[in-house]
Amino acid sequence: MKKAILGKKLGMTQIFNENGKVIPVTVIEAGPCTVIQKKTVEKDGYEAIQVAFGDIREKLRNKPVKGHFAKAGVSVKRHIKEFKLEDLNSLEIGQEIKADVFEAGERVDISGVSKGKGFQGTIRRWNAHRGPMSHGSKFHRAVGSMGASSDPSRTFKNKRMPGHMGNVNTTVLNLEVVRIIPEKNLILIKGGVPGPNKGLVQIRNTVKA
């Protein structure tokens, strides 16, 4: 069964398993997410649920969004996201999806916006090699060859060059759910997940199962 939830990355810590081994984990506040709309094939051309997550002051939302929440009978939220799930009949408008939809040991895919690094050179952005650092060399961290000379007389598209790094949608696949703390809506994920602390993340069943 497909499952999905929105959450907020709180940070990283470490826990110990029953054998005393240290496991680095990312703590995610997953939900509660409120169902605010059910999309159907007859009306919308596809099936999906629309969920909302995170509190926000009502004055910060415009009238169309306020009306959308009022129609569902739900208080205004910060984030809205659609998920395509298999069994829409089990969910009703106004119902909350909490962290306990997942279980320890499950595998999930987590999506978020990666940390922005600004304008970076090829060494940091693409892990390129440096030039000689010895005395007399004038080539240390420069780009190097960007292509041939008179033919083709241009630099090909997608050539790895300096530019903006980070701040893009990123998905990490097949991460393990180490622990669920349902009373606090917390999910502990083994390893790191994309984005900064307090960043929005999406948690779904892994496609690699």
Curated annotation (Swiss-Prot):
It holds the Pfam family Ribosomal_L3. GO terms for cellular component: cytosolic large ribosomal subunit. PANTHER family: 50S RIBOSOMAL PROTEIN L3 (PTHR11229), LARGE RIBOSOMAL SUBUNIT PROTEIN UL3C (PTHR11229:SF16). This is Large ribosomal subunit protein uL3. One of the primary rRNA binding proteins, it binds directly near the 3'-end of the 23S rRNA, where it nucleates assembly of the 50S subunit. Keywords: Ribonucleoprotein, Ribosomal protein, RNA-binding, rRNA-binding. The keyword Disulfide bond does not apply. Residues 141-163 are annotated as: Disordered. PROSITE patterns: RIBOSOMAL_L3. Belongs to the universal ribosomal protein uL3 family.
